[in-house]
């Protein structure tokens, strides 16, 4: 199996606030509703994503996870609260500056990302829209093709791809602007176990290059394997957050299969690898 290609640019900004690195995302007291006369989807929600981490946001259907992602991306506006991206108020990013090297979003509706009759056409059109010259276009598209392992898909129509292949190609497209912050809505949807492992390698490679990722997911096993921090959105606010170890071991509903099976036997174990290791250690004691 080939190792994932390394991203070609390192993002490590040095802004400081009181000696601490500025968070990638700061959401403070945010409230949002779709209908003026309807109920709040987010209720005075506050949330922070540290620079350079992978944060997974979990919660039930309709809990507001995708809404929080869209607010972070500046696609919809809350009626109350403040959002900062890398220390700068969201409203202070003028024009399309937010989407040129600052952040990119992978939406849940993957097909909405594609506009061309082939992946290659789509990628090239987006490169031109970003103002790239011919040489840069070739370099950039080959970089994302190799990183996402989709060179063999470039001449295919997006509608002819499997769900997992569409995810990878859409992800490649949002990487073209070389964003510091990745907002990913269900990125492992439609992927088999092999493709998920490949995606995990890619995300860890991007993290190593300095990227930050906020990932909305229902896939607790994937979240446990990739996240630095997990957070639970419930009743319009962040109900719990922590490392995967503390988050999943303390949660009775949103937890891994390994954590559920081993509860009471190996408290605190949340991955299959941890349970296997503890089982072997116990056997060796007898």
Language-model features: locations:
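The feature captures the beta-strand-to-loop junction immediately N-terminal to the Walker
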Residues: 58-60
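Conserved ABC ATPase "signature" region
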Residues: 124, 135-153
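ABC ATPase nucleotide-binding domains
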Residues: 1-26, 254-286
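Helix-to-loop junction immediately C-terminal to a conserved catalytic motif
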Residues: 73
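Conserved ABC transporter NBD signature motif
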Residues: 81-91, 99-100
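Conserved ABC ATPase signature
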Residues: 157-161, 165
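Conserved beta-strand-loop-alpha-helix hinge in the C-terminal portion
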Residues: 1, 237-260
């Amino acid at each position: 199996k080939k190792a994932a290609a390394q991203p070609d640019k390192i993002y490590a900004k040095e802004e400081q606030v009181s000696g601490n690195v500025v968070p990638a995302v700061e959401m403070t007291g945010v409230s949002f509703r779709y209908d003026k006369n309807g109920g709040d989807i987010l209720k005075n929600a506050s949330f922070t994503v540290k620079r350079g981490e992978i944060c997974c946001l979990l919660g039930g259907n309709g809990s507001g996870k995708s809404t929080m992602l869209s607010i972070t991306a500046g696609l919809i506006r809350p009626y109350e609260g403040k959002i900062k991206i890398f220390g700068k108020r969201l409203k202070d990013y003028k024009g399309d500056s937010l989407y040129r090297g600052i952040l990119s979003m992978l939406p849940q509706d993957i097909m909405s990302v594609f506009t061309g009759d082939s992946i290659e056409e789509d990628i090239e059109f987006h490169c031109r829209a970003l103002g790239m010259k011919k040489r840069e276009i070739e370099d950039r598209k080959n970089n994302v093709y190799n990183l996402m392992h989709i060179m063999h898909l470039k001449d295919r129509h997006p509608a002819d791809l499997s769900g997992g292949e569409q995810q990878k190609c859409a992800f490649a497209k949002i990487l073209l602007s070389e964003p510091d912050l990745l907002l990913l809505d269900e990125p492992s949807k439609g992927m088999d176990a092999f493709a998920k492992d490949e995606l995990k390698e890619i995300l860890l490679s991007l993290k190593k290059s300095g990227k930050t990722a906020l990932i909305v997911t229902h896939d607790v096993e994937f979240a446990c394997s990739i996240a630095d921090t997990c957070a639970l959105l419930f009743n319009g606010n962040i109900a719990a957050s922590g490392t995967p170890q503390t988050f999943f071991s303390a949660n009775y509903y949103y937890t891994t299969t390994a954590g559920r099976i081993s509860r009471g036997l190996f408290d605190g174990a949340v991955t299959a690898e941890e349970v296997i290791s503890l089982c072997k250690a116990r056997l060796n004691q007898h």
